[in-house]
Regions:
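Short amphipathic helix-loop junctions that connect adjacent transmembrane helices
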Residues: 36-50, 245-262
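Cytoplasmic helix-loop-helix junction between adjacent transmembrane helices
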Residues: 109-148
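Helix-to-loop junctions at the C-terminal end of transmembrane segments
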Residues: 67-78, 276-290, 379
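Helix-loop-helix hairpin linking two adjacent transmembrane segments in secondary transporters
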Residues: 143-191
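C-terminal transmembrane helical hairpin of 12-TM major facilitator-type secondary transporters
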Residues: 292-340
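Conserved MFS/SLC helix-loop-helix module at the cytosolic interface between two early adjacent transmembrane helices
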Residues: 64-103
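Juxtamembrane intracellular "pre-TM" segments in multi-pass secondary transporters
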Residues: 4-14, 194-231
Length: 407
């Protein structure tokens, strides 16, 4: 590369990443808006503690099925058309959620949204297309920052907006706002998001895009290092999703907190997670490597989950302990979330980035499907603290796997 073309390539890469950041941020902002009110909405429609976690679970079941489909399809047709379809369809899914008058229709709306928004692996593959391997953890951190900012603003405003009824129904305004954001996002991406995968780089060996392709899954996990990353990601997301979907019930039942107050805790999680993914990870990854970041993040989260489960025992100081635990969870997540896909991506072939990252995120989506149900079952059948105390042990086990298998 000549000296005069290198700055131009750097500028194009920065512009592409900036546009992708805005696209992912608006997508996740809409997702974050509905987090605080979904369990409460399910309860108002007659759901118990366990069933109240099902909207989150069915969303992730559909993501589990469709993440590898969109990932492999993007390896064949390019990233841009898949991302545009996903954003456009997600607007319809959010509108359906706002209009749904019964629990079965809420579940149907979340299922459709799960199909539509199964695009995270495509976004990660986009980053892999435009960043050299040495900068990949920094690039993946862009998605982490978008996640963090989505969790800062989305749950906070979702909690506040849920206080205002729409069409005589409480708690549905966040869904309509999310639908509007997705529509705006589609128009911006249609105009500004360039294709990252030129036709010559599109894999000729890409299989027909079908759900639950066992052969493709086996191919990805047998890539050295990728199988361990997939297993760790599954355990990590399993317990994180269980915490995320039961947290609203926990704060209401043990601390008497409203949707808005719970949204502020999620906002804290977003601030800390974004700070780690945008400031700490880019500096540490080149020095200590993604594997060590994953190990450290899992240990921090294990300690934080235990602290969260014990928070009600601290009496008047319990709320402060809850906030501390949330901040530590965010710090651990901020280290682990960008490091795992960066680790897997560095070990995948250039024409298998979508397949590898799709497999990683498909396992994560399965964990997000099982996690809320597991968390809800532990919450309802054993004790409200059980998802966090048992989750601490699970995260510690994932940390041990990381020490043994990630190099």
């Amino acid at each position: 590369v000549s000296a005069d073309t290198a700055p131009a390539q750097t500028a194009r890469r920065a512009a592409s990443l900036g546009t992708l950041f805005l696209t992912v941020f608006l997508d996740l902002l809409g997702f974050g808006l509905v987090i605080p009110f979904l369990p409460g909405l399910a309860r108002r429609l007659g759901a118990g503690d366990f069933v109240a976690t099902m909207p989150g679970a069915i969303f992730s079941v559909m993501q589990f099925v469709f993440i590898p489909i969109w990932g492999r399809l993007s390896d064949r047709v390019g990233r841009r058309p898949v991302l545009l379809w996903s954003i456009f369809a997600s607007s319809g899914g959010m509108a359906l959620l706002g209009l749904a008058p019964t629990l079965p229709l809420v579940l149907a709306a979340r299922a459709f949204s799960g199909v539509a928004t199964a695009n995270i692996a495509v976004a990660q593959a986009y980053i892999a297309d435009v960043t050299p391997p040495a900068e990949r953890a920094r690039g993946m951190g862009i998605i982490g920052i978008a996640f963090g900012l989505g969790f800062i603003l989305g749950p906070f405003f979702g909690g506040e907006l849920s206080r205002f009824p729409v069409l005589g129904r409480e708690g549905t305004l966040p869904a309509f706002v999310a639908a509007g954001l997705s529509a705006v996002n589609f128009l911006l991406a249609l105009r500004n998001l360039p294709e990252s995968l030129p036709p010559a780089a599109r894999g000729q060996r890409v299989r027909r895009a079908v759900p639950l392709d066992v052969a493709a899954f086996r191919e990805a996990v047998h890539t050295p290092g990728v199988g361990a990353a997939v297993a760790i990601n599954f355990i990590f997301i399993l317990w994180f999703a269980g915490m995320e979907q039961t947290f609203r019930l926990f704060t209401a039942d043990r601390f008497g907190m409203s949707d808005a107050a719970t949204g502020r805790v999620f906002g804290l999680v977003g601030v800390v997670s974004a700070a780690f993914q945008g400031g700490v990870v880019p500096r540490l990854a080149p020095r200590i490597g993604e594997a060590r970041l994953v190990r450290n993040g899992l240990v921090v989260m294990a300690a934080a989950f235990a602290l969260l489960g014990l928070a009600p025992l601290f009496g008047s100081a319990g709320l402060a302990v809850l906030y501390l635990a949330a901040a530590l969870i965010a710090a651990g997540n901020g280290m682990t979330q960008p490091a795992l896909p960066a680790y897997a991506s560095r070990r995948a072939a250039a024409d298998a980035q979508g397949l590898t990252l799709g497999t990683l995120q498909s396992a994560a989506a399965l964990a997000r499907a099982v996690g809320p149900l597991l968390g809800g079952a532990l919450y309802a059948a054993i004790d409200p603290r059980a998802p966090y105390l048992i989750g601490a042990a699970g995260l510690l086990a994932a940390g041990i796997i990381a020490v043994a298998r990630l190099r």
